[in-house]
Amino acid sequence: LSTVGTVTEIYDYLRLLYARIGHPHCHQCGLVVKPQDITQIVSSTVDLCVAHPEYTKKKGTRIMILSPIAKNKKGEFKELFSNLHKKGILECRVDGQILKTNTTQTLFKNNRHNIEAVLDKLVIGSVQSKPEYEKQRLTESIERALDISSGEVIVSIVTDPSFSFPDNPKQLEDHLFSQNLS
């Protein structure tokens, strides 16, 4: 289409037509992408958490609320991390890894980076939590994310076991303090 479209000069018209009448869809889930207000985002998030395969009524679904700060941008971003820490944001997800904002981050200035501020980590739908408190906290976190990133929010379901925070942690044992583990 691009060669034919360019040669016949119809490409610009097709692009304009698709932009006006087209409906963008999510490439992962197939749902139509459209603007939503905060209550719709909260409702969709809760529905997504309950429908997630790792959801159980006892444990719920663990999520992180993220605010995109830099998308595919080059730089070291030292000042950005400092400013985020001053605003009370303690963690960022940088290129998929969670990093603290108060430590000196060394990013390659010639590489492109994706940086998202971690605004909240919470569990949706567990038996210990109260639904009205969950919704209020989720709403506040999403509002803050939308304010910081000018209308965008990322809700990430945490399935990585390294993010596990057990209710009943294991007891400390002497072999955990072995020099072989250091």
Residue ranges and their predicted role:
Residues L1-N110, D120-S182:
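Cys/His-rich Zn2+-binding cysteine-cluster or related metal-binding knuckle/ribbon modules and their
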Residues I115-V118:
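Long, non-coiled-coil amphipathic alpha-helical linker/lever segments
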